[in-house]
Amino acid sequence: MILVLAILATTVAALSVARPWEDIPPTMRGGEEPTETRSVSVDFGIVTDPDTDWSAIDENLDRVGANMVVLGAGRVEFTAFDWSSHPDAAAEPGADHIARAARALQETDDGSQRDFALLVDAYVPNWIAADPSVAGAEESGYRSTYQASAYQLARGEVGDRLVEYVVALGERYLPAQIAITELFLDHTAGPQDLQLFQEMTGAEDWPRAADGTIENNADVLRWRAEVITGLLRRMRAGLDEVRDGEGAAIELAMDVRVDWQDDPAAGALASGHDYAVLLRAADRLVVWAYPFERHSPAEIEGITSALRAAGEDMSRFTMSVGLWAQTSVDDEAISPDTLVRSVRAARTNGIRSVNVTPVSLMDDALWRALARVWGPQAR
C-alpha cells in the first residue's frame, strides 16, 4: 500500500509539472458555419501576457454574443508558441499562449463552440534591422523599417518564412481561419523588385514620368497586387496539405485597407490591395472600416453599398470596426455611440461578418454598447 501511494504521488507530481494536456491545443472550430459572424480581436500583447484575465474576457464575449475570436499569433520573428523550426522566435519559450487563450474562450455561455482565427502579422522589423537588404525600398534610397520588399515576398526568405509559419499554425491548431495582416507593398523600387517586375510583366523598366522618376501607374499597382496574391496562393496550397487535407477547411483571410474617397469597392490599390485580384487567392478579405473619429457610419455603409453594387460576393467580406480614436497606435478609443453606429453600418448590404478590434481598448462602456447591437436581446 505504501509503495502504491508512493508511485501515485510521484505520478501526480510529474503530471503537475509536465501538464501534458496543456500541450494539446483545444478544438478551434465549430461544426456548421454560423449564419452571422460576430468576432472580437485579441491583440498579441494580451494573448502573451501571463496576467491576462481570460475569465473576464470570456464573460464579456458572452455578454455581446461573440461567436468567433481572432487571436494575435505574432510574427515570424516573434511567435506565440514554440515553433520547432525557429525556437529562438518564441515570445516565451515553453509557453503556448494560443492554446491557453483558446482553452479559456472556446465555449460560449450556452455551451456552443466558438470559432477561432489566428492573425499573422507580416511585419519583420527585427529581420530588417539585422539585414536591411530585405526591406522594401524607395527610389530615393529610403528603406522601410517594417515591410519586406516585393522580391522578398515573392522569391526570398521572408516570403518562404511567412508561408512556413502559416502552415505551422494550421498544422498545430487547425483553426477555422488564418488571417494575414500588415501585408502592404508601399515601397517597391529596389533593384531586386525591378527584376521581379520585369520577370512578371515582361517590361524592360519601370514606367517613368517625364522627369525620369518611377511612375506608379496602373501596371505597377496591379503588379503589387499580383505579388501579394502569389504569396497568398502559396499559403493556400500549404494549408491544403495540412493533416492529409484537413487544412483545406481552414479559411485564408487577409486584412485590407480601404479607399475611402475614390473607389471603395476596388480597394487600396497603392498598397497592393486590389480586392478583385486578392480574392483569386484569399477566401476572405477583412476590410479595415476604421472610423478613427474622421469617418462616419454613413461612410462605412458606403463601403458595403459599393461592394454590393460592384457585384461582389458579400459572404467573402468581413467588415472590421477599429476602436482607435485617431491612429492604430493610439491608446484612446472611439465613443460607445460611434461604436454602436459603426457596427450597425458595417452589417449592411448583405455583410454577415463583422469584427471589432482590439480587445485591449474595450472598457465596460464599450462592452455595454456592443451588447446593444450584438447581444441576445438585439437578435
What does each model-identified segment do?
Residues 33-37, 48, 115-172, 210, ...:
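Active-site-adjacent "subsite" loops/lids of carbohydrate-active enzymes
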Residues 41, 115-123, 179-186, 214-270, ...:
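Aromatic-lined carbohydrate-recognition surfaces of secreted/lumenal glycan-active proteins
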Residues 53-79, 171-177, 277-286, 346-354:
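Catalytic domains of carbohydrate-active enzymes, especially glycoside hydrolases
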Residues 57-58, 62, 74-128, 215-245:
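Aromatic-lined substrate-binding rim segments of carbohydrate-active enzymes
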Residues 60, 149-185, 231, 274-278, ...:
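An active-site-proximal structural segment forming one wall of the substrate-binding cleft
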Residues 68, 281-300, 313-379:
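Substrate-binding cleft of secreted/luminal carbohydrate-active enzymes
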Residues 78, 176, 181, 198-217, ...:
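Aromatic- and acid-rich polysaccharide-binding/catalytic face
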Residues 84-90, 124-147, 182-211:
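Aromatic- and acidic-residue-enriched segments that line the glycan-binding/catalytic groove
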